[in-house]
């Protein structure tokens, strides 16, 4: 003689299946989250891209690309000449920027950075390593350009390493 399971067991089984199904649908259906403020998010992405472009231009010793990111200010002309001196002095530059924080206040953008890198004069010589922290000051909305620097940034290592030798 065969007995049917009590109704409570069948109800429990169906309830479990429904809950598992709802969890699966929720997990797969809500996986794509759009930014709350899309214009600010797009601007943030442009700042990050400008930082990556600056890093790449410096590592590849690409003076025109480096120049394109700078506002025409006297402080940045000095920065650019220091970078060009690095390009002429070192055969190989490896640099890693890490963005610690980005603060956007109207048209003023501050990117707080940590960095580490190695600079090698020639293949026969050993490389010099350095690390530090600084702030890249950017400006703009659609086009992001460097307007200043603060702190210890890697540009101008040729003169710094000559002084410490």
Predicted features along the sequence, with ranges:
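Bacterial N-terminal signal peptides that target proteins for export
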Residues: 2-16
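Glycine-rich phosphate-binding "P-loop"
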Residues: 38
């Amino acid at each position: 003689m065969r007995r049917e399971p009590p109704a409570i067991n069948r109800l429990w089984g169906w309830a479990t299946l429904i809950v598992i199904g709802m969890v699966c649908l929720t997990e797969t259906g809500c996986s794509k989250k759009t930014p709350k403020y899309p214009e600010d998010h797009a601007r943030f992405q442009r700042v990050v891209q400008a930082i990556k472009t600056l890093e790449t231009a410096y590592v590849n010793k690409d003076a025109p690309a480096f120049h394109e990111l700078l506002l025409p200010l006297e402080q940045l002309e000095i920065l650019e000449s220091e970078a060009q001196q690095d390009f002429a002095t070192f055969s190989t530059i490896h640099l890693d920027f890490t963005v610690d924080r980005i603060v956007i206040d109207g048209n003023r953008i501050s990117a707080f950075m940590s960095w580490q890198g190695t600079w090698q004069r020639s293949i026969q010589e050993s490389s010099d390593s350095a690390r530090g922290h600084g702030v890249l000051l950017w400006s703009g909305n659609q086009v992001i350009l460097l307007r200043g620097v603060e702190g210890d940034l890697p540009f101008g290592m040729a003169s710094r390493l000559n002084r410490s030798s």
